[in-house]
Amino acid sequence: MGTEGTGTSVPHKKDWRENMGIANRKILHTDILIIGGGTAGCYAALTVREHSDYSIIIAEKANIKRSGCLAAGVNAINAYIVKGRKPEDYVDYCRKDADGIVREDLLLSMSQGLNRVTDKLEKLGLVILKDENGEYVARGNRNIKINGENMKPLLAKAVEELDNCQILNRVNITDYIVENNQILGAFGFSIEDNTAYEIRAKKVLCATGGAAGLYRPNNPGFSRHKMWYPPFNTGAGYAMGINAGAEMTTFEMRFIALRCKDTIAPTGTIAQGVGAKQVNSLGEVYENKYGLTTSQRVYGTVRENIEGRGPCYLRTEGITPEQDDSLKRAYLNMAPSQTLKWLESGKNPSEQNVEIEGTEPYIVGGHTASGYWVDNDRESTIRGLFAAGDVAGGCPQKYVTGAMVEGEIAAIAMVKQLDEGYLDPELDEETAFDRKIEEYDHFLDTDEKMFTYEAIEEAMQKVMDNYAGGISTHYQFNEKQLELAKEKIEQLQKLVWHISAHDMHELMFVYEVKERLTVALSVIAHLKDRKETRWHSFAENLDYPEKSKEWEIFVNSKMVDGELKMIHRDLVNLCQVPAGNMACLSLIHI
């Protein structure tokens, strides 16, 4: 018989949670550690194995089969050199979209590899749509159509078949191990059991994605994760680099996506697929009035609403029945809530325009230029630490294929450096590891803790929304607001140490909040440092509403003795920086 109705309890589970601490420790050694098993990380592993037999460990806090931005798949390759175009054309497009604040050397090396990695994806099994002549079906000047729902599983399967490659799924990396500005590995913990990891590595690739959840999102409560960027990308790689003293760039170039209202579904499929224009409530096409760059499209929508001509829409009324069907099928594959919204309304896209809105701001180096300051090999200012994908700065508009190219470039560079020889520095493993385990145990000790990670996260998002240019302020800010934002975020950082985690999964949430707070402070510092408005909405500074030639520079930062030190660097033109040579990037002032 069972215990039903007897009033007995199962105390062992409660006791396990309340007394939980790190019980096991594992020290692993590898030649190359890849942190993040998303698009860039997986492709880097494939490239390392293609060029060497060096041992690889991939640490992924989810599971590489469906992790990262590519988890649900995509319906187009958005960065591709179509017939009649050349890599330099893509560089030119990216430079114009970012109003000049880009690393042209990084853009060129990325652009030159876009078609190469696409070809490899097709060989792995990706279905790329072709016309009657066997040519790829283009969507605009830089895109080709695919059936890409299974793109990530294809990459993951190829990685899982590699020899001498250990995949640590459900392991959350929290800190780099750095001595004398050289990377030695990383610390982390398992999300599924109370095990802490020290992973010693000769080379490390950070491929952890960008940062979502810094600002209050479009949808509240239970639906807060219905957002443009993966809510599980919390800026871990940025935060680890910031705390370790790596130089970062262009965090003031936030990214705000223009999306279908409420569903936060992509708008490009409608704009490019059926040629839909942006119109206001009066039916006026307004997109040309403000400009067609990514930030200007958002800004125009914001201004039309502020000036009383909202809501704003993508004009789909009057499209053909065939286009109706095409749109519903396309969204069913990648954003089914939009198709369901049409079905629930009882109206096809041809019968009603699609309302649009901007998302909350994100920090994502795959769309803007924010991230690690790297050389052409994608090596950061910490020796042996590389960055690829959304964490790598200076190179916007990467999308899937660009992230793969950066993973490839970094992988080849790591192999080359290892081929040239590696001297293993001394490190007091036990002492450093002990300190990190004590930190984990601090949060796992639930006695007398005052706050939850959710409360701190909500407070952070409110601060950023109100004082650092969120949705509620139409993405606008002034210096006084940024000063208040900094003060309040620093207060929240102190409160983090009063959060309790009841299990290892909650411990991951605690570190996600810590990461976001670290990134938020960098965003605030960068927004305050750039005394102009170069990108409307992305960085709308009300104290400096105009663009200034004086600010045609990179705004960088580095943590020195616990304080962010701002650094200004010259723009980098095509082929200006040789691989592996950071010294030639001139310093303007510190």
Predicted regions and their residues:
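N-terminal Rossmann-like FAD-binding beta1-loop-alpha1 element of flavoenzymes
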Residues: 32-58
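Mobile, glycine/GP-rich and aromatic-enriched active-site lid/loop segments adjacent to catalytic centers
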Residues: 115, 122-174, 182, 250-399, ...
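Glycine-rich loop(s) and the adjacent beta-strand/alpha-helix scaffold that form part
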Residues: 206-265, 400-413
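Long, amphipathic alpha-helical stalk/connector segments used for oligomerization, subunit docking
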Residues: 419-503
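Extreme N-terminal leader/targeting segments of oxidoreductases
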Residues: 5-7, 11-32, 50-53, 586
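Glycine-rich FAD pyrophosphate-binding loop
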Residues: 50-72
